[in-house]
Every structure is written in C-alpha cells, then in structure tokens.
Amino acid sequence: MSSKQEPVVLGKLGSSHGIKGWLKITTYTDSVEGIFDYSPWLLKEQGEWREVKVLQWRMQGKAVVACLEGVETRDQAQALTNCEIAVTPEQMEVLPEDEFYWRDLIGCEVVNTKGYNMGKVQEIVETGSNDVLLVKANAKDGFGKAERMIPFVTEQFIQKVDLTAKQILVDWDPDF
C-alpha cells in the first residue's frame, strides 16, 4: 500500500476519563478542535484499522475528551488507550497549489539549484517561525554531512516542490 493510500494519523487516544467510556485525545492537528472536523475516524487496534464515530467531545480543562460510538464503560475506554486516530486520505482537505502536507514531503529528494543531490527529507520540524526540513544526506555525501536542516521558506530557500517527481529544489549551499 502506498503512502497515498495509507490512513493519515491525526492523533491518538489517551487515558480513560470518568466511568462512562470517555477518552482523552492527543491531537496532531493545528488546532485541538481540528481533529473533530473529520468523521468517521479510523482507530488502529492490534495492527488493524476500524471505523468509529465520535458521538460527543468537549474541552475538559486544558485537555480534550471524546465519547466514541460503542465505548460505554471505563474498561472499554482503557482497552483503547494509545490507539492511533487516523482518517482516509480522501477525507483530507485539498490544499492550494503552494501548500503541502508534511507526509507528502517526507521521502522527497532534495536537490539544490546547482544540481547537487543533498539527500531525502526524513522529517519535518516545526520551529514556530517556520518549518524545517531534516534532510538525511546520501551515504557518499561530498561534504561529509550526515544530515542538513533547511528552512521551509518558499522563494527564499525552497524554489520548487514537485510531488509527482518527489523532488524539492532548494537554493541552499550543500556545505551548510
């Protein structure tokens, strides 16, 4: 199954909350409420994905809790602790041409404007001011680098992103 078909993980279930089957939610979406824009959810239990509906959710202090269909007791909720929450790729919003999901950038080759292959995007780090590509250098990197951190700032450093070719063109010195 390609990464395009794999479910998109948006969070995970935390510990149970109360005695009626509510669960704390850890969300990876930009806003805490963003995870509830998607329905149904997919839960990964024992390596298998299954569909589940959110019946209710609310803020509980600084935490967010939810009640899921078919989860009515504390024991049922505890059995789901640490399950990943995902959605199908088709449920994801279509982004404007100049915006990208991180999952689509991971694995892209990074080439600078002089044609030097700097490696592949291994991870993306959120720094507050801008995202940063963590690029794992090729084994035979001519500059002796194991990895590079390249700010994802379009026009200044990121010249072009071609998701079809899985390539990112950057204006970046390979010695950095």
From Swiss-Prot:
One of its GO terms (molecular function) is ribosome binding. InterPro entries: PRC_barrel-like_sf, PRC_RimM, RimM, RimM_N, RimM_N_sf, Transl_B-barrel_sf. GO terms for biological process: ribosomal small subunit biogenesis; rRNA processing. SUPFAM superfamilies: PRC-barrel domain, Translation proteins. Signal peptide: none annotated. Keywords: Chaperone, Cytoplasm, Ribosome biogenesis, rRNA processing. One of its GO terms (cellular component) is cytoplasm. Residues 96-176 form the PRC barrel domain. Gene3D superfamilies: PRC-barrel domain (2.30.30.240), RimM (2.40.30.60). The keyword Magnesium does not apply. Binds ribosomal protein uS19. Belongs to the RimM family. HAMAP family: Ribosome_mat_RimM (MF_00014). An accessory protein needed during the final step in the assembly of 30S ribosomal subunit, possibly for assembly of the head region. Essential for efficient processing of 16S rRNA. May be needed both before and after RbfA during the maturation of 16S rRNA. It has affinity for free ribosomal 30S subunits but not for 70S ribosomes. This is Ribosome maturation factor RimM. It comes from Shewanella piezotolerans (strain WP3 / JCM 13877). The gene is rimM.
